[in-house]
Amino acid sequence: MKINIGDRLDNIILPSLNGSIFELKSTIGKKLLLTFYRFAACPMCNLRINDLKKNYDSFGSNFIHVAIFNSDLNNLKRFTKKHDAPFPILADQNFEYFQKYSVKRSLPRFLWSQIIRIDRQVKGIIKGYIPWTFKGHITTLPVDVLIDENGVVQIVKYAKDLGDHISIATIKQFTNN
C-alpha cells in the first residue's frame, strides 16, 4: 500500500543498529521523519544521514528520525555505525516494510540519478561512504514520511531519483510548528 497524507502506519518492528528491537509505536508523542533508504553502503544515503545528523539539534527535542535500510544488521553496522547517529537506524533485511509501503525500485531512475546527482555521489565517496559491497537492492528509490505527534502522516515523498528527499528546510518548518 502506498503511504498517503492522513494515514496512520502499522507498527514497524525491526532490529536497530544499537542492538535493540525498535517499534515505530514508541515514537507516538514525537514528530517523526521516517525514511526508507537503499542498501547500507549507498554513498548518497549515508551523506543524507550525515546531513540530518548535522542539523538534528535544529529540529527540536520533540523530533525523531527513523532510518530504515534494506540491509542485514551486520552489513548495516559495517557501513553506518561511524555516524554515531542520535536516532535509530534499522535493518529491513527482507525488504518487508519496503514492499508493504510500495517503496519502488527503478533501473532507469537509478541510472538517471548517476548523472543528475553525480555531485552528491562524489561528495559521499569523498566523505568515505564507499560502496564496497552491494547487499540489498541498489535501484531502490528513497521514501521520506513526516508524521505528527499523533501518528498521522502529514507529508510523504516518494523519490523520483536517488537523492530526492524532503528538504532540511521543510523538516525544520514541520518540527518547529
For each feature predicted by the language model, list its residue ranges:
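Short secondary-structure boundary/capping segments
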Residues: 1, 24-26, 57, 135-137
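N-terminal "domain-start" segment that seeds a small globular fold
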Residues: 1-25
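A structure-centric signal for secondary-structure junctions around beta-strands
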Residues: 9, 21, 28-30, 62, ...
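Short active-site neighborhood of thiol/selenol oxidoreductases, capturing the structured segment around
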Residues: 24-52
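Short beta-strand/turn micro-motifs composed of small residues
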Residues: 37, 69, 148
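Structural microenvironment flanking redox-active thiols in thiol-disulfide oxidoreductases
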Residues: 48-100
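Thiol/selenol-based redox catalytic cores and closely related redox-interacting motifs
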Residues: 92-163
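A short, polar/charged loop-to-alpha-helix boundary motif
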Residues: 162-177
